Amino acid sequence: MKLLAFRRLLRIQRVVIRYRLDDLILELPMLPWWLRLLGATLPWRWLPRRKLELTRGARLRLALQDLGPIFIKFGQILSTRRDLLPDDIANELAWLQDKVPPFPPELAVKRIEEQLGAKIEQVFARFEREPLASASVAQVHAARLKSGEEVVVKVIRPNLEPVIRSDIAWLFILARLAERVSSEARRLHPVEVVSDYEKTIVDELDLLREAANASQLRRNFEGSPLLYVPQVYWDWCRPKVLVMERIYGIPVTDLETLRDQRTDFKALAERGVEIFFTQVFRDSFFHADMHPGNIFVSTRAPWSPQYIAVDCGIVGSLTDEDQDYLARNLIAFFKRDYRKVAQLHIDSGWVPAETKVNDFEAAIRTVCEPIFEKPLKDISFGQVLLRLFQTARRFNMEIQPQLVLLQKTLLNIEGLGRQLYPELDLWATAQPFLERWMRERVSPKQLLRNFQQQVEQVPHLSQMARDTLERLSQPHAHNAPPPEWKGSRHDWLGRLVGAVLLVGAAEVGLGQQLEAWPAWVMLAGGVFLILRR
């Protein structure tokens, strides 16, 4: 392992010198003066150099390609972090292609047989040794099961784990070094970025996780005319082998073939947006790797086109708080209510409570007002989120990984949608989803359902009430600090009674009794007592 790490270090050094990445590093404004001086004395900087007619982004992209698949994937992920990188570098890294030569079919067969515990002929009636596709982590072969189903077999590359461990270790070393020498680098959280990447790549190595993701996404869209997800054949899935239904569709970028079959491009573009918002606001679970290589269009019913999604190795999930953040901010943004956007961030704790709302509002207005001078149909949701993240980061907002994934996915969907149908108006398509979701969030039925989820707390309520009343009656008993109640004791007792009524409403509303009038009465009374001032 140490020998491998040393060899990788030498390889990294050679690539840095070849593409003169040291020039890029020394240009960083966050670099301390003493490190800049030390870097200027590096031995190879005194040697004759060949002239590089390349931009800094192109040099970085080529260097990552030379360093191999793990660095390529890291560059791809970095390209989505436009809240961290300059646009010219992010745009160049987006061109990184995760394509590598296939490994020998004998190794693929050997790994499949090891994982399945059976000879290839015992499982498959036919197995095509020439792979359909090959990438940095895995390659895919076509096959037919003994039972007759046409399938694809995805198999993880052999001997990949040691290389990943070595490369990740060096990325962590570089990230920690950056944090130690520069306060500006610490603000960008490089160690956190590498940690997110490590989790992504480790997750991609577990094909059972990908199978589970695909299975859930398929279940979420079962019978839907919008999206089809291939079936997983669980009997033949293992950590390093995945067997799925083979699909036959048109690559979404093959516009000529789509035109030939008279596909409705407007419907196709709008359905892509509809699929995204359905995943986000209905399911709280979304395919986070929706680049064109993973999306196909069914050949059936081109007048009502259906998408086909593959490769569910990267997915995102959202909490209620994430959904609320996204919906409220997007609605406020498109109303150009920057004050509300700023206040939402502070009230929800996304930015520190001591943040001055006027300063935050002004910063948001400065970066977003130019965007909203365009017609609504020309505005990019992804760019709006990106500008918000960039601004909020300056106010010490911790950007959650799932929101970064969502922003990247939204940019992909937007780019694809406008490639298919340039007149696509995302706001017109998305607005009904956002407004319907907001209405449902405050509907009485949803409130009752939320309380039902918390009904396990009911047994603790009486003890909590007793403890609270004891503290109210003896606020300065013993050496306990006086509680910081907002308002009078009667206000707090009213809120306590309101809480009891709300929990009671949840109890009455359990099962099929959501329409029972006592539940509605208790709900109304509880809300009144809690919210009254």
Curated annotation (Swiss-Prot):
The keyword Cell membrane applies. Belongs to the ABC1 family. UbiB subfamily. Its EC number is 2.7.-.-. ATP binds at residues 132-140, 154. Keywords: ATP-binding, Cell inner membrane, Cell membrane, Kinase, Membrane, Nucleotide-binding, Transferase, Transmembrane, Transmembrane helix, Ubiquinone biosynthesis. The keyword Transmembrane applies. CDD domains: UbiB. Its main location: membrane. Pathway: Cofactor biosynthesis; ubiquinone biosynthesis [regulation]. InterPro entries: ABC1_dom, Kinase-like_dom_sf, UbiB, UbiB_bact, UbiB_kinase. It is found in: Cell inner membrane. Residues 126-494 form the Protein kinase domain. It comes from Pseudomonas aeruginosa (strain UCBPP-PA14). SUPFAM superfamilies: Protein kinase-like (PK-like) (SSF56112). It is a multi-pass membrane protein. One of its GO terms (molecular function) is protein kinase activity. Pfam families: ABC1. Is probably a protein kinase regulator of UbiI activity which is involved in aerobic coenzyme Q (ubiquinone) biosynthesis. This is Probable protein kinase UbiB.
